[in-house]
């Protein structure tokens, strides 16, 4: 009920013997209370909507990416399951993710329409959009390589989300560098099992994670590090609409950034 504040305000004014002007004042104060309460309720409703859309769209687009290569294989499904494991998805949340993945695999999946809807709901929250794209890039690279069809789909996603080709290519380099810090891809062994593809991080990998060059000075590197840590702060992302189920991935990404920064400091000799 959006008028309890007014009722209480008027009742208090009458009990205190405030007369006509007391009632008017109580009504105005109650009205302000009702408006504030209404805005708060609307914020929570929008937050839930944003989180639900982020969750569903993430797995729908993941399914669409997988299908773009052709037939969805058992290995593809295994990779998607691994990602769900990383998010600690169980029970109803996991079932919802699996259903969304199947929706995305349909031949007539409206990718551009879905991305426009997603961008509209995440308007003004570039860090959310960035997190979404990073998850999709990670999923596309999960088998150790980027299929041309997957790249084409990712370009469409980036375009619809307002991300330039140059920004997208930088994201790719950052994700490739992050793979060496535990954020990564999978590769199939001779026995048919999947394992993380790691050769050990280099200075170049670390710089790619932060989006800087090995020749950049300490000030530039520190600025890039602080900006990325702020954009990937798990609590901030959840407050802006990241589903709580994906908070673990945000934490892992923040850890990659931290590890990359520590390696750069060690290699370049600054504090």
UniProtKB/Swiss-Prot annotation:
Name of the gene this protein is made from: djlA
GO cellular component: membrane; plasma membrane
UniProt xrefs under InterPro entries: DjlA, DjlA_DnaK_co-chaperone, DjlA_N, DnaJ_domain, J_dom_sf, TerB-like
Record GO terms (molecular function): protein-folding chaperone binding
Record's keyword annotation contains NADP: no
Places the protein is found: Cell inner membrane
Parts of the chain on the Periplasmic side: 1-6
Keywords associated with the record: Cell inner membrane, Cell membrane, Chaperone, Membrane, Transmembrane, Transmembrane helix
Protein name: Co-chaperone protein DjlA
């Amino acid at each position: 009920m959006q008028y309890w504040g007014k009722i209480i305000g008027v009742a208090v004014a009458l009990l205190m013997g405030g007369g006509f002007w007391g009632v008017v004042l109580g009504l105005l104060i109650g009205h302000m209370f009702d408006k504030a309460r209404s805005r708060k309720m609307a914020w929570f409703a929008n937050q839930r909507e944003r989180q639900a859309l982020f969750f569903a769209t993430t797995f729908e687009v993941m399914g669409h990416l997988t299908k773009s290569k052709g037939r969805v294989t058992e290995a593809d499904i295994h990779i998607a399951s691994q990602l769900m494991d990383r998010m600690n998805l169980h029970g109803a949340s996991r079932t919802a993710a699996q259903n969304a993945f199947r929706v995305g695999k349909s031949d007539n999946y409206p990718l551009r329409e879905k991305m426009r809807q997603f961008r509209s709901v995440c308007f003004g929250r570039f860090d959310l959009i960035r997190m979404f794209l990073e998850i999709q890039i990670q999923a596309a690279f999960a088998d150790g390589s980027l299929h041309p069809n997957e790249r084409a789909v990712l370009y469409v996603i980036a375009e619809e989300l307002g991300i330039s080709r140059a920004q997208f290519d930088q994201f790719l380099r950052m994700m490739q560098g992050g793979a060496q810090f535990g954020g990564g891809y999978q590769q199939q062994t001779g026995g048919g099992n999947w394992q993380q593809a790691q050769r050990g991080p280099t200075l170049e990998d670390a710089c790619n994670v932060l989006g800087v060059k090995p020749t950049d000075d300490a000030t530039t590197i520190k600025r890039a590090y602080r900006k990325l840590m702020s954009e990937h702060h798990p609590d901030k992302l959840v407050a802006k609409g990241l589903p709580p189920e994906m908070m673990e991935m945000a934490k892992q990404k923040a850890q990659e950034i931290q590890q990359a920064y520590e390696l750069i400091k060690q290699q370049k000799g600054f504090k």
